[in-house]
């Protein structure tokens, strides 16, 4: 019995493929392309002014700050200031488990409106909630918009009913 098992293992080892098929790595849904070179308009003022801050934890993720991917978990997060800075991720109402009315990106205490509703099938699949498929956000800051040095960014997710917002913790980053 042992001899037969050894023979099977040896046969399998000898017939194993030394050149496996090349596999395509699927694109990272969270890694949005960098903004194109060229003029970028300054971001619009945020939408959360006058809304009540909710106490619940925001359901959000900040995928990138410029060239820094996953700045929440990979510190120090740094990006050059001589190019446009894309900040993107996803956010949704954690209480309603539904898309938000919008998202603001708050940089050093100033809120800027983000484009909201980008496709994020990965979010819908992860949370097993098909209604969260359009919860992506992005805001692009023009080159030179932020001075070199340390900054903090937070994400404000506007509740689905539009009556308040959920705010993330501040995430530090540096513009070089």
Language-model-detected regions and their locations in the chain:
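Long, low-complexity serine/threonine/glycine- and acidic-rich segments characteristic of extracellular
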Residues: 33-86, 90-176
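Bacterial signal peptide processing site
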Residues: 18-20
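Residue-level detector of transmembrane insertion/anchoring sites
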Residues: 8-9, 98
